[in-house]
């Protein structure tokens, strides 16, 4: 069984419905961009596009949302974002809009076998069983194929001319971090064979609350072969709670310690929770929630600028800006960064 697990995009179904209505009311079809592409202005110089793709080979829908800078003529680096279990393409908006405002395209993939439909399908009494089914190896593998299909589709489609295929990054939260790890080169053995799902076009990976590989006796054989830069972000109270899949912050640290690559960074925030990295404003309380989100998105873009453009100035300055919230900061391959051992 491959890992698992996060929280839904929003705790309130009425809030999710209002969001859907609001997006639908502002959407328009852009001429020249092809069928299935709908757009709305997200503010702050950012445009957001919904695309409803279908992978014919697997007969599986792959809905996505793309965040782009509203005005740019340069080819954009691309972030492929994978949501946690029970999420959707509309989640992690705070990251998508920030990436776009900083000059990146951010493509948020919805994984239909482990998306928000889990919360509404069937009886509440069977919810745990549905979550456990969504965490099985077949869905974990399908998620990586979703990511690869989305990358192929966006590069081959009308938006491809605006993107730089040499600067592609995978990112994800919880189950989505597991998806990103598998795409980055994590190798697990199932039924006597190695599952090598590596996507060679990835230049780096961003992991929010990465779970362990459940049932595996050791992480180094799985993660030691990852050879691209990685950013790991968690909190001291980052705990996954689901029957059969309990995981705390020590597991996030173990993933960081086991992973290979020439450059890696671990940031552990004081306080917070597993759900604080979603769009929800309540986990940790409004004050802490807002500050951890701000620190996370600034760290992510600083890491990307350093990794993709070779400029670590923002990354070296980041700890001083957020020192009061950092419980632990470690790094390999980031010269001049002041670390804070936990």
Residue ranges and their predicted role:
Residues 1-13, 24-27:
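N-terminal secretory signal peptides
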Residues 36-68, 202, 334-337:
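A domain-start/cap signature at the N-terminus of enzymes
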Residues 57-163:
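Serine-hydrolase catalytic machinery in alpha/beta-hydrolase-like enzymes
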Residues 81-85, 174, 210, 235:
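Glycine-rich His-Gly loop
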Residues 133-138, 216-219, 284-294:
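Active-site rim elements
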Residues 152-220:
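Primarily recognizes the serine-hydrolase "nucleophile elbow" in alpha/beta-hydrolase
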Residues 194-267:
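The feature captures the conserved acid-bearing segment of alpha/beta-hydrolase catalytic domains
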Residues 271-273, 278-342:
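Alpha/beta-hydrolase-fold serine-hydrolase catalytic core, especially in secreted/extracellular enzymes
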């Amino acid at each position: 069984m491959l890992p698992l697990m996060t929280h839904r995009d929003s705790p309130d179904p009425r809030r999710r419905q209002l969001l859907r209505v609001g997006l639908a009311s502002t959407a328009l079809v852009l001429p020249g961009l092809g069928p299935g592409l709908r757009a709305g202005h997200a503010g702050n110089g950012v445009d957001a596009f919904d695309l409803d793709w279908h992978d014919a080979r697997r007969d599986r829908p792959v809905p996505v949302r793309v965040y782009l800078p509203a005005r740019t003529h340069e080819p954009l680096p691309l972030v492929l974002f994978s949501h946690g279990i029970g999420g959707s393409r509309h989640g992690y908006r705070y990251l998508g809009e920030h990436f776009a405002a900083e000059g990146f395209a951010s493509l948020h993939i919805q994984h239909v076998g482990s998306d928000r439909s889990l919360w509404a399908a069937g009886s509440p009494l069977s919810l745990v069983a549905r979550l456990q089914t969504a965490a099985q190896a077949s869905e974990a593998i399908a998620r990586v194929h979703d990511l690869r299909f989305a990358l192929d589709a966006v590069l081959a489609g009308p938006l491809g001319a605006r993107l730089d295929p040499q600067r592609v990054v995978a990112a994800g939260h919880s189950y989505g971090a597991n998806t990103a790890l598998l795409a980055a080169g994590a190798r697990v053995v199932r039924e006597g064979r190695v599952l090598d799902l590596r996507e060679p076009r990835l230049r780096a990976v961003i992991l929010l609350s990465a779970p362990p590989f459940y049932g595996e006796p050791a992480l180094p054989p799985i993660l030691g072969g990852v050879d691209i830069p990685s950013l790991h972000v968690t909190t001291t109270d980052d705990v996954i709670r689901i029957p059969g899949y309990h995981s705390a912050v020590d597991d996030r640290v173990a993933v960081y310690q086991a992973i290979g690559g020439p450059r890696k960074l671990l940031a552990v925030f004081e306080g917070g929770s597993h759900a604080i990295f979603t769009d929800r404003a309540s986990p940790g309380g409004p004050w802490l929630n807002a500050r951890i989100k701000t620190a996370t998105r600034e760290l992510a873009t600083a890491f990307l600028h350093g990794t993709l453009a070779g400029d670590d100035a923002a990354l070296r300055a980041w700890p001083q800006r957020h020192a009061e919230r950092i419980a632990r900061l470690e790094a390999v391959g980031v010269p001049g960064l002041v670390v804070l051992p936990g």
